[in-house]
Amino acid sequence: MAYVPRLRQEYNERVKSALKEEFSYSNIMEVPKLTKIVISRGVGGAVADKKLIDHAIDELSAISGQKAVSTISKKDVASFKLRKGMPIGAKVTLRGYRMYEFLDRLITSALPRVRDFNGIKSNGFDGRGNYNLGVTEQIIFPEIDIDAVNRIAGMDITFVTTADTDKEAKALLTELGLPFKKN
């Protein structure tokens, strides 16, 4: 039998039926699912120091288990000495098994390492069933060697789902194990 990530198996066995019952869908294919996770990071000092982009790409690659790519500026901004086409950040898009593996590591090992952690805020939904989570330090991930970090930097993690509403998306992410704050 082939390997299946723990959260993928849990989604298929438990979460699908729970969401179908909760929102009374008529068809199992209506149940929302996680499509992709995008981890992105802007590097403000990249205009002056090109090595910062390489460090960001290396760290995102270590965290995600997949090669990250640099993002480039779309237009000139004179006040930042920024030209069109200059690298200004890094991102990685996770789908399939790698997405579920990353989500599992985020829930079980990274989020508990956040100082004074008591759940993630539920105000990061965009109205279309997607959720954005901001992480302030990359050192919460066990894949990052603290001694090798030259600058503490945060990142944005976007969970893209097929849910139509924020309520459905929150129910999906809660069932998968994301610890939202109790209001």
Swiss-Prot record:
GO cellular component: ribonucleoprotein complex; ribosome
UniProt feature coiled coil, ranges: none
Keyword match rRNA-binding: yes
Organism superkingdom: Bacteria
SUBUNIT field: Part of the 50S ribosomal subunit; part of the 5S rRNA/L5/L18/L25 subcomplex. Contacts the 5S rRNA and the P site tRNA. Forms a bridge to the 30S subunit in the 70S ribosome.
Record-linked Gene3D superfamilies: 3.30.1440.10
Listed GO biological process terms: translation
Pfam families xrefs: Ribosomal_L5, Ribosomal_L5_C
Family matches, as PANTHER family: 60S RIBOSOMAL PROTEIN L11-RELATED
UniProt GO MF annotations: rRNA binding; structural constituent of ribosome; tRNA binding
Protein name: Large ribosomal subunit protein uL5
Family: Belongs to the universal ribosomal protein uL5 family.
UniProt entry keywords in alphabetical sequence: Ribonucleoprotein, Ribosomal protein, RNA-binding, rRNA-binding, tRNA-binding
Function: This is one of the proteins that bind and probably mediate the attachment of the 5S RNA into the large ribosomal subunit, where it forms part of the central protuberance. In the 70S ribosome it contacts protein S13 of the 30S subunit (bridge B1b), connecting the 2 subunits; this bridge is implicated in subunit movement. Contacts the P site tRNA; the 5S rRNA and some of its associated proteins might help stabilize positioning of ribosome-bound tRNAs.
InterPro entries: Ribosomal_uL5, Ribosomal_uL5_bac-type, Ribosomal_uL5_C, Ribosomal_uL5_dom_sf, Ribosomal_uL5_N
